[in-house]
Amino acid sequence: MKKISLKSADQKIWFVSDLHLGHDKPFILGPRKYQNVNEAYTHTHEMLKMIGPDDILFNLGDMVIGAGANSMEYAKRIVYLPCKHQYFIWGNHNAGIQQMYDECRSEVGLLADDIEIYPLTYRNSNFTFLGHRAEIFIDGRAVILDHYPIASWNHIGKGAMHIHGHTHLNLQGDKRLLRIDASWEWKRRPVEWSEMLREVGDKKVFSPDHHCGVE
């Protein structure tokens, strides 16, 4: 895969994970302070307007729950956000987005279920599937992207950061580990690269269990 190397001076770079649009369970809605699925979608869509037409978004999985009509509508609205480019990492709730990926695979002649190709851009959009993990570079710094928090990563002792989502335990911050959680629970909005740099390694910043949220 072609190396993704970005300069923060050229555009804003945003991160988000675990939008869980369409998820109607109280253990997700409650901690996020939403009354219902529609309120969750309305607020999420409003917050995503922070991302401008010249900006880059990295979406770290679990965008929508299920593959029903409403979930697919939510998914396509996110896919077609008017930003310069959006890169997607697989999560663990993939039904809806998997359907869109399979459409892309069939269009390039990949019909076998066990064959994957990355990067792959969804039709007439700036939305690109990157796979299950990616290493990118921002201002020369390596950044490891994964839906799941991992214990060790490439260049871990040389300033490389790890940005993830999907936390089912409260992982306390550690200044020795440049790891930070982009899940929706943290800010209830996308988080921009400069803010990530300010907060990573702060022991007061932790990865919240997204079934419990942040007080």
Residue ranges with predicted function:
Residues 1-35, 186-215:
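Acidic, histidine-bearing metal-coordination/catalytic regions of metal-dependent phosphoesterases
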Residues 7-10, 14-16, 21-130:
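Core catalytic region of metal-dependent phosphoesterases/phosphodiesterases
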Residues 105-215:
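Conserved beta-sheet core of the metallophosphoesterase superfamily
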